[in-house]
Amino acid sequence: MCDLCNGEDALPRRQFLRLAAVGAVTVAAGVALDHGTAAAKPKSSGSTTPKVERVAAPAIVTRAQWGADESIRDNHIVGWAPFRKIIVHHTASPNGVKDPAAAVRFGYKLHVIDRKFTDIGYNFLIGPDGEIFEGRRARRYGKGELHTGEDGAGNAIIGGHTKGRNAGTCGIALIGNFMKTPPSNAAIESLIHLIAWEAQRHKIDPMGRDPYIATDSTHLDFFNIAGHRDIGSTLCPGTRMAASLGWLRKQVAERAGRFPERKADMRRLAWVIN
């Protein structure tokens, strides 16, 4: 798993409530193919792209389907918050795996047993063949219900992928090491699809830089679709992935549309403290 994807946030109830009052949020995203370097840092225009079609829900491999051993995880849930940003990771594991589900199981055990997480840190993982895997468990789903990682009100389970920046951020990990090698086209296509779907559902501007307040009350300025290295001391999601973030944002914006910038003092995350 990626270096420094060691970040579950153990926050006291008082701090959770304070963050809810100011509208805390987190970020996620990063990608890489040879599509050019990351673009300059534009502010959200506040406009909406006209005639954008609804992004269809992607197929998601459930925890049961990839073989999660539910007996090893902690049933404690840190909290819930709607996605406001996307953070892209790589697992920094060998490329070209033949059995992506086995790689997900390995990462799950690494996070839970070795790093003492309550569960796998990522919200979603994507294999080299483009399969999208359910990450951290949110709840029991009904028959035929899509495993979104959210409660019934659209609040997402808080992950453990970027320490101090987990609340409100969707952590997506591409399986592999993308320092010198780019992800497969299939993986990139699934990444674009997944982010566009989340962006449209949660009204995240793919080209924007909405204000974000970390769990330690630090005010951060970064893209709504960002790489782990943009907000942490790490090489994740790999040099080749990070170089294509600007291109990725544009691809997502074409599919999902644009949305008005959120102001930090106007956001109110719906926290549920267990």
Per-region residue spans from a language model:
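Active-site acidic/histidine clusters and adjacent loop/turn architecture
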Residues: 81-116, 121
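Conserved, mostly hydrophobic/aromatic
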Residues: 124
